[in-house]
Amino acid sequence: MSAASESKYSTEVLSELLSKLQVADNKDEAASNISTFLNSSIVEHDVPVEFFEDLKKQIQSKDAKVSLAALDAYKHIASTNGLSPSVEPYVVDLVSEVAVKAGDKNKDVQTAASDALLAIASAITPTAVKAILPKLIDNLTNTNKWTEKVAILRAVSQLVDTAKAQIALRMPELIPVLSESMWDTKKEVKEAATATMTKSTETIDNKDIEKFIPQLISCIAKPTEVPETVHLLGATTFVSEVTMATLSIMAPLLSRGLAERDTAIKRKAAVIVDNMCKLVEDPQIVAPFMDKLLPGLKNNFANMADPEAREVTQRALNTLRRVGAVGENDSIPEVSTAGDIDVTLNEFNKLVADKKIAKRFDVALNYIAAIAGDLVDEREIQPEAWLQNVLPFATIFLHEKEAKEIIEEFRKRAIDNIPQPPSFEDEEDEGEDLCNCEFSLAYGAKILLNKTQFRLKRNRRYGLCGPNGAGKSTLMRAIANGQVEGFPTQDECKTVYVEHDIDGTHADTTVVEFVIEDGEVGLTKDVVVDKLREFNFSDEMINMPIQSLSGGWKMKLALARAVLKNADILLLDEPTNHLDTVNVAWLVNYLNTCGITSIIVSHDSGFLDNVTQYIIHYEGFKLRKYKGNLSEFVKKCPSAQSYYELGASDLEFRFPEPGFLEGVKTKQKAIVKVSNMSFQYPGTSKPQIQDINFQCSLSSRIAVIGPNGAGKSTLINVLTGELLPTTGEVYVHENCRIAYIKQHAFAHIDNHLDKTPSEYIQWRFQTGEDRETMDRASRQINEEDEQNMNKIFKIEGTPRRIAGIHARRKFKNSYEYEISWMLGENIGMKNERWVPMMSVDNTWLPRGELMETHAKLVAEVDMKEALASGQFRPLTRKEIEEHCAMLGLDAELVSHSRIRGLSGGQKVKLVLAACTWQRPHLIVLDEPTNYLDRDSLGALSKALKAFEGGIVIITHSAEFTKDLTEEVWAVLDGRMTPSGHNWVQGQGSGPRIEKKDDEEEDKFDAMGNKIAAAKKKKKLSSAELRKKKKERMKKKKELGDAYVSSDEEF
């Protein structure tokens, strides 16, 4: 039998079976016969178009029996296992007609239509969702019949099970329709829509919002729940990749949250937008939601009064614009049409134009276009996937061989239309791979890296660059602790993290024992000693306790231990911290010649230039690799210029202006003076520093330089009162406030890691004094002080001892102090006793009489007076946030993040902010370049230049100090040689410092209440006084007895 005859025969059989269906006693059996014949006995390249046209007419029939039988046949066809590709497109094409029947008046027809919809939703090819879903959505939107709506909603729920991944991509068009159905007046529709919405959220693969999905669905139906839901999500840590499905369920909440009246809700909605959008990888993911989110953020930024909330909104706007690739004038990029059925159909029709495809195959062509559109939306580019999904339907009208060729060309053309997210090829060369993996990394409440590639080769030196808080140190520690997914284990690749500060628990351990005791080294003492000598350790140093080593030598010791572990990869976090220039040069030479792969985090641009072969840079939660050293990297990435030049930083720091110092009329006058000072630690053979002379003023810009162990930090500790000099004199102006940031800056905050920065500052200054300075040696009363304080004074003929010093007032060119007394009785006898006297017996003594015996008590009073002269600052959240913002910490970190979760650089900024809270006159920085990134270093450099007080800096970074300091203190072997100084006696020359009344800041009491200061009257000249007198006399003459004078007339 010929193909034409067979086709005619098939059509006749189907017509006969369909006509029998109407009169059959067992309709299920008759429908099953049709299904069996359709799915197995049709001739290849033939489609029973006439049968489906007849079936469509019967489904639409107003006769319930006819329609019921046709729907039963439709259900059986769809329910057959292995629905034939030549039948499936035509079955799906009738979905709209079947859905309409679900709203029929006849209950049996309604049920049959509903069951038929479920059957086709279960049987459809998953990638053909774009062929069926638009039809269902169209029916759902346009019908008024609630039974039809319920049937369609149940079918959509079934589609989620059939094609979960594909429905996830359709969520942007599905969620608005489901939301509208949830507001339907019919209870059954509301319930079905809520159930379908819940079912559709199964496509959302995002663990961050999983537990909030019930609340997200609920607030769609009940807008009053939006504020509470925003609050819940505002405290969420977002670390999972954000997909189109995730944004589909979040966008309705966020757009409503941005439109709420309450500023706090608007702010939190902006925070959520900011945090979620950072995890979007492709602009096309966020494109469908831009018209909802962007206008809301812009409107809030323009109209909100709260500056902090506006700042948060601005940050969210910047993130959304960057992620969404928003153009100039906020032109929103169009959503890609590469996956539209019209586009893919047009491409396919071009490819088969010469094949003369018959009209009856149009339905199949549209079906292929829908499948191709889904593959494009899924970013599927593999040829196997295209063949598997498209070939069964293309062979309806093409031979298999030519179909494969056409599909491959179709695939190439389709994927060329897909907009590609930014991607970068690593600049690599040949060599042995030590690591090649993909991973994500989060720290606390922050995503650091999201599905990034990481590849390392043997004998390469990599510099790891990124801003503070990007996660450089966290990545290094994660690698060392085996927490990076896919990174080789220690057995496969020995990775050693070189600590920049050895744990204090080893303080008394000798250098050689420290290395030998490490279980991973496993070497004899002789081998360890030889290696330490290779690292320039002398025999004396090898047997010294670790606490006696300077910071630089501790770094060399940690490096020596790492090398002895036979490391394949060295992880070096700020290796040049505490190293002088000689040791930095040694380290450069060692890393360049040792043959060990190293990953280096450093803020020393010169060091990175001399060592690195590749730069690994943090870019949008990815790691991108650039070949070449830092200078080569900056050429390729100009935005990273601040890594190379401190002055190129756009970040700005500001220090508060120091308060007025009584008696200091020029910036040259000494506020700190040290004469013939020396210091020696107890138990040591010689002084650590000796014969030290210097002075500091408000104009001082001093760099303290010298090799490791020369005594620089000891000198500074004496200057700031941390240590008391063994001999010599240290004068500090009575009202002078000194801010001291230690070499190990984290020492200030180590015991407060579970506080927020705001809480830490409130704790530190809650009494008005700086609680961090209370343990300084200059404030501790020792036995010698107690003996001196037993001195007996003869006051008004009675023997007295000082009980306390309470207040200070001006006395000639100095001060005198209010003293409370104890009265002596029976002095020198066994029953000697000292009785506290009443406050009315208090007297005043000059400073000179007290300094010899009660210097520390006098200093306490001076400090309180100094604080009072700076005025109390209100310890309110707003004041603290504004102060911290001057040092580069935003309000989110200051008030809403624990110190434990801050990066190293952010912690240093916090220490800077806390130490300068009391508006110091002198800022002393010990190694400020440690831990701060290049941007922050540039900002710090500019802030120090603009600071109105004095600056003393210990640093090995010539780059940092070269344009900043004028005076140099060179410390070598315990002696200090100053140069470039301009020390003066008395006030010196230069412009006078005037305390201007009109420039005084607002004053506050300790509770934060503003004190209204009375304005001082301006002194009038004699001419002005005469004029006032004439005006008074004139008024008196005019008014007579009714005249009453006022203060303003005098």
From Swiss-Prot:
Residues 429-646, 672-998 form the ABC transporter domain. One of its GO terms (cellular component) is cytoplasm. It catalyses: ATP + H2O = ADP + phosphate + H(+). Pathway: Protein biosynthesis; polypeptide chain elongation. ADP binds at V43, H45, S86, T395, H399, E400, N708, E927, N930, H956. Keywords: ATP-binding, Cytoplasm, Elongation factor, Hydrolase, Nucleotide-binding, Protein biosynthesis, Repeat, RNA-binding. GO terms for biological process: translational elongation. It is found in: Cytoplasm. Residues 1013-1037 have a biased composition (Basic residues). HEAT repeats lie at residues 46-83, 89-126, 127-165, 169-206, 208-244, 245-282, 288-326. Residues 980-1050 are annotated as: Disordered. It holds the Pfam family 4HB. GO terms for molecular function: ATP binding; ATP hydrolysis activity; GTPase activity; RNA binding; translation elongation factor activity. It comes from the Eukaryota. Its EC number is 3.6.4.-. InterPro entries: AAA+_ATPase (IPR003593), ABC_transporter-like_ATP-bd (IPR003439), ABC_transporter-like_CS (IPR017871), ABCF_EF3_subfamily (IPR050611), ARM-like (IPR011989), ARM-type_fold (IPR016024), eEF3_ABC2_chromodomain-like (IPR015688), eEF3_chromodomain-like_sf (IPR047038). The keyword Coiled coil does not apply. PANTHER family: ATP-BINDING TRANSPORT PROTEIN-RELATED, ELONGATION FACTOR 3A-RELATED. Belongs to the ABC transporter superfamily. ABCF family. EF3 subfamily. Ribosome-dependent ATPase that functions in cytoplasmic translation elongation. Required for the ATP-dependent release of deacylated tRNA from the ribosomal E-site during protein biosynthesis. Stimulates the eEF1A-dependent binding of aminoacyl-tRNA to the ribosomal A-site, which has reduced affinity for tRNA as long as the E-site is occupied. Assists translation termination by stimulating the release of nascent protein from the ribosome by release factors. Has antigenic properties. Monomer. This is Elongation factor 3. It comes from Candida albicans (strain SC5314 / ATCC MYA-2876). The gene is CEF3.
